[in-house]
Amino acid sequence: MDIASKVEGFPTLGILYYTSTLLAVCTYAALIIISIPKTGPASLVRYSSPAIVLTVGKQLFHASYGVSGSLAHRSLTLALTALFILQCCNFLVLTRLDAKDLAKKNIFQDSDHMIYKAYRVVCLIFNVRGIGTPWQAKHLCGFPRFYQRGKGRGPTPIWFILRQSLIVAWQCLLLDIIYTTSMSTPKEDTLKLFGEGTEYMYLDANAEQWTGRFIAGIIAWVIPGRVSIDLPHRVLSIISVFLGFSSPQQWPPLFGSMLDAYTIRGFWSTFWHSYCRWTLTTISSFICRDFLRLPRPSIVERYLNIAFVFLGSAVVHMAIDSFCWGPPMKTKLPTLAFFGSLVVGIIIEDTIQALCRRITGEKRRDGDDGVPVWHKLVGYIWVSFWFMMTSPWYLYHNSRLPPDDTWLVPVSFVDTFGLDTATMLLFGSGVILKFAIGIEV
């Protein structure tokens, strides 16, 4: 798809409708949160509000389908929409936050005007990682050492915007090359590697199909998957800081280092983005502790909590897939199986680590300190193996989508200057950025 067709088909009205509706439903939830008590007759309005929020959320899902012609853009928009809607419901009926609670947490002051209070609650709903609040997600990656050069103790707006802009340009070039390369692959080769049913081939898979598993299980996560989610986050941070809506300190890196992904647990808790963590852990904690009343701490509560988090993530991703891909809708059980397998993988690795500690008498380590290199190497092999076995269940469908649905950036440098030139520029600029501004790995 060329840029002219993308510009002609730019859904301005659809984006305005989606944005205004999202702001309206979040503002409605915020007003209920700060004005309706948690108990008493009036609380019925609070506890019935999720029905309205979820109904509008369904309409937002339909509206967000037309926000972009790119699967990656639609998927991220739908994912964030789902999280915003679920967060509204969390605040209303699960954590049951009210004006007093939020004042105690320094979200606003009791003396603030109601309009400002509503604004702060809407910002909290959009702040799905809880940055700068008591609910901030654990294991967030700190700011790069680049910002500590000289006498600096943190990012200044100018350096933050400059660094983010350079990385965004480099990421756009990377995604452009990936898309162009994938489109140049003959259709028969794509079908051979990622065709219907190949995700379930193991013993009878040939070397080329195992290469496809390596691409889907490892490369797809750490390069295009990571970058396609990270790029919009950086763009939003540039706009927000440039317009003065927020400070650079409110935009820590979205992803951690891939070097920390030597366990499945570490992959999701330390390396991968934490967009879903606050929302889904709130729901899982409510089910395990308030509804099922499981003792805490206990093994059952710990792993059932993890299971409900990944189940919630699976449900969100299945809903996204249904709206992104459109009819005819195929079964989404492979997606459910993939996210469920992660729970099994975490239980396996926790069990093996516990047995090793019992045999050797070694104490459990907190964090990354003191982990031997050979432990990490074994861990990388383990995580790679598990993702190669299970990721195709979830990711192979993307490779079967039509080309017009899989573009990643609106302007193609490759189409203008050629793939060879773009590739040389990518590697050359990547080395420069690594040493000049400390681009993350």
From Swiss-Prot:
SS bonds (residue pairs): none
PANTHER family: LONG-CHAIN-ALCOHOL O-FATTY-ACYLTRANSFERASE 3-RELATED, WAX SYNTHASE DOMAIN-CONTAINING PROTEIN-RELATED
Pathway(s) this gene product operates in, as recorded in its UniProt entry: Sesquiterpene biosynthesis; trichothecene biosynthesis
Note: Trichothecenes are sesquiterpenoid toxins that act by inhibiting protein biosynthesis.
GO biological process terms, semicolon-separated: lipid metabolic process
InterPro entries: Wax_synthase, Wax_synthase_dom
Main location: membrane
UniProt superkingdom: Eukaryota
Compartment list: Membrane
Induction field: Expression is positively regulated by the trichothecene cluster-specific transcription activator TRI10.
Family, similarity comment: Belongs to the wax synthase family.
Organism expressing this protein natively: Fusarium sporotrichioides
Protein's UniProt keywords contain Transferase: yes
A Pfam family: MBOAT_2
Membrane topology: Multi-pass membrane protein
Record-level GO cellular component terms: membrane
Entry protein name: Acetyltransferase TRI7
Alphabetized GO MF terms: O-acyltransferase activity
Record function comment: Acetyltransferase; part of the core gene cluster that mediates the biosynthesis of trichothecenes, a very large family of chemically related bicyclic sesquiterpene compounds acting as mycotoxins, including T2-toxin. The biosynthesis of trichothecenes begins with the cyclization of farnesyl diphosphate to trichodiene and is catalyzed by the trichodiene synthase TRI5. Trichodiene undergoes a series of oxygenations catalyzed by the cytochrome P450 monooxygenase TRI4.
Enzyme Commission number, as recorded: 2.3.1.-
Keywords per UniProt: Acyltransferase, Membrane, Transferase, Transmembrane, Transmembrane helix
